[in-house]
C-alpha cells in the first residue's frame, strides 16, 4: 500500500522547517512510519547541489538555477521519495515541485509551461497527496529568514529583491486554488499552526 506524501511550501521565513519538524515528531509519537526530507538537499547528491544553489557568492542564471533544482528533484524522487512511499511510509517534504513553479516560473519569469513540463517529467507521477502553503507577509518572512544567518543577510535566494519574493507569494496564492493545497495564515503561533496541520494530516491517515 502506497504511503502518504505531504509537502510544505511558502516564502522564505514562513516557518515551513519548524512546522515539518513538529509534525514529524507528533506522527512518530503516534506510531506512524514517517520520514522527513527537504529540497534542495534531500540526498547526498542533493546536498552538493544545495551548496551551489544557496551560496551567496555564486552568480547564477535563471535557467541554470532551474535545471539544478530539477536535477536535485530527479535524484530525490528516485533515491528517497518513491522507495519510501512504495514501502508505505509517510513522507514529509520541505518544498517540492511547487517551489520551482513559484520561484523559477513566477519569480524568475521563466516560461511556466516549460517549468511545469520538465518538473512533471522529473517527478514521474510522484505527486504530493496534500500540500500546505504557509502564507506570510513578504517583509516579515524575509526579516525572519535573514535573521537566522550569521551575517543577517541570508542565502542567495533570501538576498533577492522584495519584488521577487512578492511574485513568489502571489504564485502560491494562484497555485493554492487547486484542491490539493491548503493555505494557512503563518502569522500565528507555531502551536496554533501545528494543530491545524496535524488535524488535517491525521484525517488523511485514518481514512
Curated annotation (Swiss-Prot):
Full protein name: Thymidylate kinase
Chain residues that bind ATP: 10-17
Name of the gene: tmk
Family classification: Belongs to the thymidylate kinase family.
SUPFAM superfamilies the UniProt entry points to: P-loop containing nucleoside triphosphate hydrolases
Cellular component aspect of the GO annotation: cytosol
Top EC class of this enzyme: transferase
Keyword field: ATP-binding, Kinase, Nucleotide biosynthesis, Nucleotide-binding, Transferase
Reactions accelerated catalytically: dTMP + ATP = dTDP + ADP
EC number(s) reported in the record: 2.7.4.9
Organism this protein belongs to: Halothermothrix orenii (strain H 168 / OCM 544 / DSM 9562)
Pfam families assigned to the protein according to its UniProt record, in alphabetical order: Thymidylate_kin (PF02223)
Source organism superkingdom: Bacteria
GO molecular function: ATP binding; dTMP kinase activity
The keyword Kinase belongs to this UniProt entry's keyword annotation: yes
InterPro entries, alphabetized: P-loop_NTPase, Thymidylate_kin-like_dom, Thymidylate_kinase
Membrane-spanning segments: none
Entry keyword Nucleotidyltransferase: no
Biological process according to GO: dTDP biosynthetic process; dTTP biosynthetic process; dUDP biosynthetic process
Main function: Phosphorylation of dTMP to form dTDP in both de novo and salvage pathways of dTTP synthesis.
Amino acid at each position: 500500500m502506497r504511503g502518504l506524501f505531504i509537502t510544505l511550501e511558502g516564502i522564505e521565513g514562513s516557518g515551513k522547517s519548524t512546522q515539518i519538524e513538529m509534525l514529524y515528531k507528533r506522527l512518530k509519537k503516534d506510531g506512524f512510519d514517517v520520514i522527513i526530507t527537504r529540497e534542495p538537499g534531500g540526498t547526498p547528491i542533493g546536498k552538493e547541489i544545495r551548496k551551489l544553489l544557496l551560496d551567496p557568492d555564486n552568480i547564477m542564471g535563471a535557467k541554470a538555477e532551474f535545471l539544478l533544482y530539477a536535477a536535485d528533484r530527479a535524484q530525490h524522487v528516485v533515491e528517497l521519495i518513491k522507495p519510501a512511499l512504495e514501502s508505505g511510509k509517510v513522507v514529509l517534504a520541505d518544498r517540492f515541485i511547487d517551489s520551482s513553479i513559484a520561484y523559477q516560473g513566477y519569480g524568475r519569469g521563466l516560461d511556466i509551461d516549460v517549468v511545469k513540463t520538465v518538473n512533471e517529467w522529473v517527478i514521474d507521477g510522484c505527486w504530493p497527496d496534500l500540500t500546505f502553503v504557509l502564507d506570510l507577509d513578504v517583509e516579515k518572512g524575509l526579516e525572519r529568514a535573514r535573521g537566522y544567518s550569521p551575517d543577517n543577510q541570508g542565502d542567495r535566494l533570501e538576498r533577492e529583491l522584495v519584488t521577487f519574493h512578492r511574485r513568489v507569494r502571489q504564485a502560491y496564492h494562484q497555485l493554492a486554488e487547486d484542491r490539493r493545497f491548503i493555505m494557512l495564515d503563518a502569522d500565528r503561533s507555531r502551536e496554533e499552526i501545528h494543530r491545524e496541520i496535524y488535524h488535517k494530516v491525521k484525517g488523511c491517515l485514518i481514512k
